[in-house]
Design a protein with these regions (language model features):
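Phosphate- and other anionic-substrate recognition elements at nucleic-acid/protein interfaces
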Residues: 1-231
Length: 231
């Protein structure tokens, strides 16, 4: 099993690939937004994506002050880690190997938002290691992921959502989420609904892990991941 995470404070997402000798390869797409519109949640339910709203208001630094803000984020980070680790535990059977991959922070990132992200992600990964759920952990730079997706370099900087577009062209061929993205069924007015970018990035994290680690880790072949990237 490979679980690729696009980890964020507001709307973390995961693409879990399970390789079974008898059942073949299966994909789970799941996200845990702080909050999401009912119309968006309904669209996800219609294309095989599990979307669990945490029903949280944003933490207000002004209203709570620095100390209370830090404590609020730590409590939320711990609660989120418990939710995600509980879900991973429910998907992992005895004898399964679980590899967890995530995207690293971009070079030059700074500010409170990045500090909070590092806190949430650190609490999550520490929890994985503490309970021994993951057999190995991997982290990849944003540039590495973009290279795997075929959209690295200056030529793609002007494009609005290259990782989403690449997913629509190259995502798992039998999954309804791929079809929904390819046919632009998850757009509200002129923009993608919340979490589409996170779910697509999570897929590219998973695919990056497979490509980079398959020789060393002995992953079973995943046909969709072996295909040439359509550009």
């Amino acid at each position: 099993m490979i679980a690729g995470f696009d980890f964020s404070v507001a709307k973390p997402a995961c693409c879990l690939v399970t390789m079974d000798a008898a059942a073949g390869v299966s994909y789970d797409f799941i996200c845990w937004p702080q909050d999401i519109k009912k119309s968006a949640a309904a669209k996800y339910a219609g294309c095989g994506v599990s979307c669990y709203s945490r029903n949280l208001e944003p933490v207000s630094h002004v209203a709570e002050g620095s100390t209370e803000t830090v404590k609020a984020h730590i409590r939320r980070a711990m609660a989120l880690a418990d939710i995600i680790n509980g879900w991973l535990s429910s998907r992992k059977n005895d004898g399964d190997l679980l590899y967890v991959a995530s995207e690293g922070l971009s070079f030059g990132s700074k500010g409170d938002a990045v500090t909070n992200l590092a806190t949430y992600k650190g609490v999550f990964l520490a929890g994985l290691m503490r309970i021994g759920l993951a057999d190995d952990l991997f982290t990849y730079s944003p540039t590495t992921m973009k290279s795997v997706a075929g959209c690295a370099g200056k030529a793609f900087r002007s494009l609005k959502d290259p990782m989403i577009e690449r997913f629509g062209q190259n995502g798992p061929s039998e999954h309804p989420f791929t079809w929904a993205v390819r046919n632009r069924r998850l757009i509200a007015k002129t923009a993608w609904i919340d979490c589409v970018d996170d779910l697509c990035d999570a897929y590219w994290v998973t695919r990056t892990c497979y490509i980079k680690e398959k020789d060393m880790s002995g992953f079973p072949e995943i046909p969709d991941f072996e295909k040439e990237i359509i550009i």
